């Protein structure tokens, strides 16, 4: 139990960006990440995909190593590196978050994983045909493009600085509560 407490105290904070498909999660992140970086917050992202994904290309050396049976392949050059891992079963969000380098990351934004028990900002747009999803105990704020009466912070989905302010304040509170 002590290890768990120590780990929890040293964990990089995770903040989910959730909502239905088409709610603008990726678009919001594309605009939000540079805004947070300008505030000297080092951001990393975990994105969940429901589709089978292939990072490398068929026939390339890294693909051939994977096809030969390697459980992990690191592809590296002078600018970046990526590790590709074959997983026989789904991995947890906690496991994925532990893969980040703490010296490069202050905050992990998580796109998807909406059922995970992590703090999150829920996105919804007025033009969506689906109603506002359930606001569970982990939803810190709701970002919309329409007025809404809720018992959480309401953010304007089109005002990136406002959302960044909210995240920056939450992040300071997270570090202060540790």
Curated annotation (Swiss-Prot):
Task: Provide this UniProt record's keywords sorted from A to Z.
Answer: GTP-binding, Molybdenum cofactor biosynthesis, Nucleotide-binding
- GO biological process terms held by the UniProt record: Mo-molybdopterin cofactor biosynthetic process
What InterPro entries is this protein classified in? MGD_biosynthesis_adapter (IPR052539), MobB_dom (IPR004435), P-loop_NTPase (IPR027417)
An example molecular function term from Gene Ontology annotations: GTP binding
Q: State the protein's purpose.
A: GTP-binding protein that is not required for the biosynthesis of Mo-molybdopterin guanine dinucleotide (Mo-MGD) cofactor, and not necessary for the formation of active molybdoenzymes using this form of molybdenum cofactor. May act as an adapter protein to achieve the efficient biosynthesis and utilization of MGD. Displays a weak intrinsic GTPase activity.
Q: What's the protein called, per UniProt?
A: Molybdopterin-guanine dinucleotide biosynthesis adapter protein
Record keyword GTP-binding present: yes
Which residues does the annotation say bind GTP? Answer: 22-26, 56-59, 103-106
Q: Where are the transmembrane segments?
A: none
What family does the database annotate? Belongs to the MobB family.
